């Protein structure tokens, strides 16, 4: 079985070798852990973001920069294609580990989750486990993790602190923005899973999403980065569905973000109206704008949802002069 942490460790090695070119900073903590700053104190950028995205996906996807037409504006975008969608996106990329140690908080994603089984129920559902001597994690945070954070991660992953490797970037950074848009395929799979679809039948996934500019602080950028997927994220999945075509159509109909009661305005406005409480925001909103599925069993293709660039332009706050 593929080891996501082994795959991720190869990406980390590349990041260490190319740190100067990536405009990142490598930090060695006293307990031996390796931290790669991709946008907190370091400048980072598009290439650092690409490496972050590769790391999140355990290098099990083909990633390319592209462009997206936002009502006549050619906007930077990222394409994701994978033939290991469940392992790449759910066993690795999914941001399923809330890490809170003292005054430190970050959202953990990437390979190390598979060692810590974060969350355990998901790994049981997809039948995946990893066994590797190093833990490779991507952290979305505005602070660099210290020794106490590393010790917490090492304990949960059953590895030595010196074998913990963390790449970190804040939401309000170019690298952070890139890796969030690269979650476009994963958000669709997660939405499928949340409505009772057997995600193990998903054989491949492709997606494209614009990359948000820096519009403000981390909370404001959380809005614009999510909007990239919610309003202009497009995904295609190949599945081998055991069931009637009508049942598959019903699943596909329920996946796009357009089905959410909170759909229709920039996410920051929705989040602010909910007093910045995620639990008051409809979770169904976190999905691609348009989803297309090709079923290998029925030899049919189904599509649902649509793209809404005008809302994304509002979210970005673009001023034409």
From Swiss-Prot:
Under Gene3D superfamilies, the record lists:
Methenyltetrahydromethanopterin Cyclohydrolase, Chain A, domain 1, Methenyltetrahydromethanopterin Cyclohydrolase, Chain A, domain 2
Q: Name one GO molecular function term.
A: methenyltetrahydromethanopterin cyclohydrolase activity
Name of one Pfam family that matches: MCH
TM spans (from-to): none
Q: Which domain of life is it from?
A: Archaea
Which catalysed reactions does the entry list for this protein? 5,10-methenyl-5,6,7,8-tetrahydromethanopterin + H2O = N(5)-formyl-5,6,7,8-tetrahydromethanopterin + H(+)
- Keywords, A to Z? Cytoplasm, Hydrolase, Methanogenesis, One-carbon metabolism
SUPFAM superfamilies named among the record's database cross-references:
Methenyltetrahydromethanopterin cyclohydrolase (SSF56199)
- Alphabetically, which GO biological process terms does the record hold? methanogenesis, from carbon dioxide; one-carbon metabolic process
* Listed InterPro entries: METHMP_CycHdrlase
The principal localisation class reads cytoplasm
Is the tRNA processing keyword given for this protein? no
User: What pathway is this protein said to act in by its record?
Assistant: One-carbon metabolism; methanogenesis from CO(2); 5,10-methenyl-5,6,7,8-tetrahydromethanopterin from CO(2): step 3/3
Give the UniProt entry's GO cellular component terms. cytoplasm
* Compartments, record wording: Cytoplasm
Q: What is its EC number?
A: 3.5.4.27
Primary enzyme class? hydrolase
Entry's family note: Belongs to the MCH family.
What does the record give as the function of this protein? Catalyzes the reversible interconversion of 5-formyl-H(4)MPT to methenyl-H(4)MPT(+).
Protein name (Swiss-Prot/TrEMBL): Methenyltetrahydromethanopterin cyclohydrolase
């Amino acid at each position: 079985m593929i080891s996501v942490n082994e795959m991720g460790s190869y990406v980390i090695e590349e990041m260490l070798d190319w740190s100067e070119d990536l405009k990142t900073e490598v930090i060695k903590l006293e307990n031996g852990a390796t931290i790669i700053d991709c946008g907190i104190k370091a400048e980072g950028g598009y290439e650092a973001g690409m490496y972050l995205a590769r790391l999140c996906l355990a290098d099990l996807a083909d990633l390319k920069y592209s462009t997206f037409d936002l009502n006549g504006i050619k906007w930077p975008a990222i394409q994701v294609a994978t033939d290991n969608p469940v392992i790449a996106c759910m066993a690795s990329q999914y941001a399923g580990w809330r890490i809170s140690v003292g005054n430190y908080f970050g959202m953990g994603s990437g390979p190390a989750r598979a060692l810590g089984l974060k969350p355990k129920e998901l790994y049981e559902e997809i039948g995946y486990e990893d066994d590797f001597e190093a833990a490779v994690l991507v952290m979305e945070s505005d602070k660099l993790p210290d020794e106490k954070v590393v010790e917490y991660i090492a304990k949960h992953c059953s590895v030595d602190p010196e074998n913990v490797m963390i790449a970190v970037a804040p939401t309000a950074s170019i690298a952070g923005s890139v890796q969030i848009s690269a979650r476009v395929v994963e958000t669709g799979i997660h939405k499928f899973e949340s409505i009772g679809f057997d995600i193990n039948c998903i054989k491949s996934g492709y997606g494209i999403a614009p990359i948000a500019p820096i519009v403000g602080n981390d909370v404001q950028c959380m809005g614009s980065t999510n909007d990239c997927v919610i309003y202009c994220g497009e995904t295609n999945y190949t599945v081998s569905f055991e069931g009637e075509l009508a049942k598959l159509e019903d699943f596909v109909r329920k996946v796009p973000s357009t089905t959410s009661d909170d759909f229709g305005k920039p996410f920051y406005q929705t989040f602010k109206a909910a007093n910045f409480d995620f639990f008051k925001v409809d979770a169904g909103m976190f999905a691609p704008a348009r989803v297309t599925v090709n079923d290998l069993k029925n030899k049919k293709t189904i599509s649902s949802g649509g793209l809404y660039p005008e809302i994304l332009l509002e979210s970005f706050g673009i001023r034409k002069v």
